[in-house]
Amino acid sequence: MEAQYRNHDGDTSFSSLRVYLNSLSDTPSRFSRRAVSVSTSYDEMSRVRAVSGEQMRRTLRWYDLIGLGIGGMIGAGVFVTTGRASRLYAGPSIVVSYAIAGLCALLSAFCYTEFAVHLPVAGGAFSYIRITFGEFPAFITGANLIMDYVLSNAAVSRGFTAYLGSAFGISTSEWRFIVSGLPNGFNEIDPIAVIVVLAVTFVICYSTRESSKVNMVLTALHIAFIVFVIVMGFSKGDVKNLTRPDNPENPSGFFPFGVSGVFNGAAMVYLSYIGYDAVSTMAEEVKDPVKDIPMGISGSVAIVIVLYCLMAISMSMLLPYDLIDAEAPYSAAFSKSEGWEWVTRVVGIGASFGILTSLIVAMLGQARYMCVIGRSRVVPIWFAKVHPKTSTPVNASAFLGIFTAVLALFTDLNVLLNLVSIGTLFVFYMVANAVIFRRYVTVGYTEPWPTLSFLCLFSITSILFTLVWQLAPSGPPKWFILGASTVTAIAIVQIFHCVVPQARIPEFWGVPLMPWTPCVSIFLNIFLLGSLDAPSYIRFGFFSGLVVLVYVFYSVHASYDAEGDGSLDFKDVESLERINRVLS
């Protein structure tokens, strides 16, 4: 068994059908050995990283990260989300919703920042969860995150066709054609979306530094168009619209839907801040991770908060909230005003730039996730290779780019959008839990059960709050349960904070107000997960089931073989001492 276990090719289990069948019979023991096996920070930055062959060049600075963060967050969706949340949930107080959502996004970004500073590798959340909870949880979350990236990128690229048509006054149908033999939802061919995806794929394969430069130019143009729309909104707007609806029978005031409306609006617009997580995957290519990563991630979120709040105020001043078009607020508002119809095309141009920037950042991120998952051997090692000339993960970039292009060619936008979001929120939830666990538990030295019990109790309390908020009818019983849940959650955090000491204090940068900051992030992500529809959970369950099958029939055996040949083993005493210095 030991001879079979050790093979320098790393694929002993797949050398023949007979050997593979024998390996399957040993799946339970291999699963128990590998599923919760944690890597170390030093291994991730040295031995595992070396699997790629070449190193990714460290060419990025803090301003590159800020540009990538802004480009990843501010896509075309902001032109729609603001109007929808204002009309349906918050009214003029949508600016408060954006501020609350932005603060919560900043708290979640802090969790990513602590990990990225102390573990500057390209794996992002996959690596963070792998060194905390083990290989199997990391693979489940990483695979779902990559699928969400691919699906959202395909949807965004098809949206580019629509906004480009709006900018030039051309109907989308003139750029797409119908194939009668294909089923509905998959029969509208979009060649422009394919061209855009393949062009972005070429750029990110060629050079990360050049990709950053392209993103900086497009982001600057996009921000210029956003500022233009904001100025137009303020100049044409009326302060009275912040408190008076068009129909006197509708609720009035700055908070027409009350506090609940503000928080419901915050839950909707929070997704507009998603994108900063992709910046963490660039950590391996940052010149000075300790200084540049905190400035890049936090700085980009702060700038986006300001832009979103200004857009929300200008939108609320432009029209009474009950006249806002939920689907195309800015375009509809300006098109109804004599002499201002041309602004509609400006919105289309700005949205087109936003789509390109979000596509560049997301495709950079998805390729680096796949690259590091390949390094861990749970997918073929081919994905881990870094090209010696470009210093980019060309194999992962090209494969995912082609896959995205195929989806964008055939699949309708609505079909894609119904499959996106839950995976990203789930990963945010896992990272917030992981940063607490890493602070309070040192494997082999600290008892993990107090921390695990705390995380479970806090999550259960947050789930109870979310279910009551979503399902219970309004009235005193609902508010009593919500209040009791809030008090219980606060008490749980305070008791944990007082009773359980931190096992590790970050040397360079750490999440402030531990454990309160990540706990707010945990609660928010559970709250947002509770607002998603049933098809989202069905998709998540179905795809997660497929991921489990892949892990059972392939990944656990490939990982087991890699452990046998020493790729994932760790026994060097000198290296152990270096780990202690890194993690102290």
Curated annotation (Swiss-Prot):
Single GO molecular function: transmembrane transporter activity
Q: What is this protein called?
A: Cationic amino acid transporter 7, chloroplastic
Q: Which UniProt keywords apply?
A: Amino-acid transport, Chloroplast, Membrane, Plastid, Transit peptide, Transmembrane, Transmembrane helix, Transport
Q: Which organism is it from?
A: Arabidopsis thaliana
Transit peptide from where to where?
1-49
Superkingdom of this entry's organism?
Eukaryota
What GO cellular component entries does it have?
chloroplast membrane
What the entry lists under Pfam families is as follows: AA_permease_2, AA_permease_C
Family assignment? Belongs to the amino acid-polyamine-organocation (APC) superfamily. Cationic amino acid transporter (CAT) (TC 2.A.3.3) family.
Membrane topology is: Multi-pass membrane protein
Q: Which InterPro entries match?
A: AA/rel_permease1, CAT_C
Described by its record, this protein's role is as follows: Permease involved in the transport of the cationic amino acids.
Gene Ontology biological-process annotations: amino acid transport
Where found, per UniProt?
Answer: Plastid, Chloroplast membrane
**Which gene carries the instructions for this protein?**
CAT7
The UniProt entry lists the main location of this chain as: plastid
**Segments passing through the bilayer:** 62-82, 90-110, 131-151, 185-205, 214-234, 254-274, 293-313, 346-366, 396-416, 417-437, 449-469, 480-500, 508-528, 540-560
Q: Is Calcium set as a keyword in this record?
A: no
